[in-house]
């Protein structure tokens, strides 16, 4: 059986889809998946053993110059790649009009998705042949697991979902695996940042632990923040710029991780690493870290200024 997945973004949403593949792989021997995903996240599906082909899409980039000759050529090549296979099922796990119209509609196969009442954007359901009612008040991982089970005709397991990507990195862990922590300090929204003075206080509190701390970054302003956090601490390392796979390898070898609400926090969960995620205004209930050893540290009054380093240290002691 060959199935196409349409789940293009974001990083957390893409990662939250992986346990559904594991369920299907266990329920339907020999099943294989192709996966349409935004080019920036194209490495992620390849880490799962059930994925045979990754089809990158670049809607975010294309829309800036949709009708230019180079972009038209890219869109044509994408359409040809998408339509090269006749699928037993096409599962749109994105639930948005944009992806349904520009991707799902063009694929060959019976199209499954959430119904008008439960899709993220109800109009997206008009593009599906089979519409499934998936209750909203459950974690995003469980919603996707239920969608796959109903689309492919098996019962959703009652056990916790398994991302099944940690093993991809086990044969290539860093030589110092287990000897360091990773602090994920960067996120997209200002109100989801933990103040730098709190990060530095936590780093100072770990001075006698013997653990080294690694700080990844993606953009130049994040590198500058990492340097400020590391200043004066010999046991803190600002990492070089890395690919997503490179960062995943570092996370896979971490003894533990402390993170803000960011896509890399979900990657940590997918890699089964102990993780404390600090939350301010966002509610982790339905979209927070899902997996083994994932702990939430909520800020008083939903403001991360009010979350001190001692509270995070106390959580660390319980990992």
Swiss-Prot record:
SUPFAM superfamilies: UDP-Glycosyltransferase/glycogen phosphorylase. Pfam families: Glyco_transf_9. It is found in: Cell inner membrane. The keyword Aminoacyl-tRNA synthetase does not apply. It catalyses: an alpha-Kdo-(2->4)-alpha-Kdo-(2->6)-lipid A + ADP-L-glycero-beta-D-manno-heptose = an L-alpha-D-Hep-(1->5)-[alpha-Kdo-(2->4)]-alpha-Kdo-(2->6)-lipid A + ADP + H(+); alpha-Kdo-(2->4)-alpha-Kdo-(2->6)-lipid A (E. coli) + ADP-L-glycero-beta-D-manno-heptose = L-alpha-D-Hep-(1->5)-[alpha-Kdo-(2->4)]-alpha-Kdo-(2->6)-lipid A (E. coli) + ADP + H(+). Belongs to the glycosyltransferase 9 family. This is Lipopolysaccharide heptosyltransferase 1.
